[in-house]
């Protein structure tokens, strides 16, 4: 993702200060200034676009908040403690947090909430199916969880109270109101998500397929341009696109 972000930043004509390598040892492109750590990068920048691993989020949150540097975060698979660190940082700086920055997925999230508000949980079972490349380490994907949260908001419930993502063996009948997840991994699939509302007499499906990670990088740069100079707060791509 880093190389695509660099290309999109330059295409937008925005000054690129530099970057740091991820915990997997991947370094920035050779023509990008490399900083020793997140604190050094934050001190030199107005805004940081971050696609590193979840384990780095708490340290990044503290360093960016201390430096007053805005943060566009696209790391998925965050724990409750890591999400809390993001929220704490958002009390001091502008944070745009999204598991997926593509405009298409953002529209899916908006539609999912609206559909869930109209289709009663007692009659329409909500299921989310996602597939990604074989190297992806977290499941369900952050985007799938985001879709689930959108459905839960539309229904006025907490996702944690209705999630069903561990079906195996004899599970018994489906719980009314549950939001189900199925995760597939294989090949080099960039990302595919389908939200299904299944009733006794009809089925509605909403699908997004990503074919190139460039859409994520372009969306992240769009979020960065929107967040630059903005006051503290926790924002999403729906805010960036003016959907709420």
Regions found by a protein language model. Give the residues of each.
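Rossmann-fold NAD(P)-binding glycine/threonine-rich loop
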Residues: 58-67, 74-97, 106-114
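Short glycine-/small-residue-rich Rossmann-like dinucleotide-binding loops
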Residues: 52-53, 76, 183-185
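An anion/phosphate-binding loop that grips the pyrophosphate of nucleotide cofactors and donors
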Residues: 45
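C-terminal substrate-binding/catalytic lobe of Rossmann-fold NAD(P)-dependent oxidoreductases
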Residues: 2-41, 123-244
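Rossmann-like NAD(P)H-binding beta-loop-alpha module
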Residues: 107-123, 139
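Anion (oxyanion) recognition and catalysis
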Residues: 10, 65, 120
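Hydrophobic beta-strand scaffold residues
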Residues: 16, 34, 71-72, 95-97
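N-terminal Rossmann-like NAD(P) cofactor-binding module of classical short-chain dehydrogenase/reductase
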Residues: 48-49
């Amino acid at each position: 993702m880093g190389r695509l972000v660099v290309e999109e930043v330059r295409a937008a004509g925005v000054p690129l200060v530099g970057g740091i390598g991820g915990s997997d040892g991947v370094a920035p492109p050779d023509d990008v200034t490399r900083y020793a750590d997140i604190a050094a990068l934050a001190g030199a920048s107005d805004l940081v676009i971050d696609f590193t691993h979840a384990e780095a989020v708490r340290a990044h949150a503290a360093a960016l908040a201390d430096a007053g540097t805005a943060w566009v975060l696209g790391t998925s698979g965050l724990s409750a403690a890591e999400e809390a660190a993001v929220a704490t940082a958002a009390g001091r700086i502008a944070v745009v947090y999204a598991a997926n920055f593509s405009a298409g997925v953002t529209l899916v999230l908006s539609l999912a909430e609206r559909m869930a508000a109209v289709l009663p949980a007692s009659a329409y079972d909500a299921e989310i199916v996602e597939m990604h490349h074989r190297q992806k380490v977290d499941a369900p994907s952050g985007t799938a969880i985001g879709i689930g949260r959108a459905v839960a908001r539309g229904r006025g419930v907490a996702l944690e109270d209705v999630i069903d993502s561990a079906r195996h063996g004899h599970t018994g009948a489906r719980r009314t109101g549950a939001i189900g997840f199925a995760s597939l991994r294989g090949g080099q699939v960039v990302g595919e998500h389908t939200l299904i509302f299944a009733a006794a007499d009809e089925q509605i499906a909403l699908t997004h397929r990503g074919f190139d990670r460039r859409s994520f990088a372009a969306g992240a740069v769009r979020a960065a341009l929107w967040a630059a100079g903005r006051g503290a707060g926790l924002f999403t791509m729906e805010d960036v696109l003016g959907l709420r």
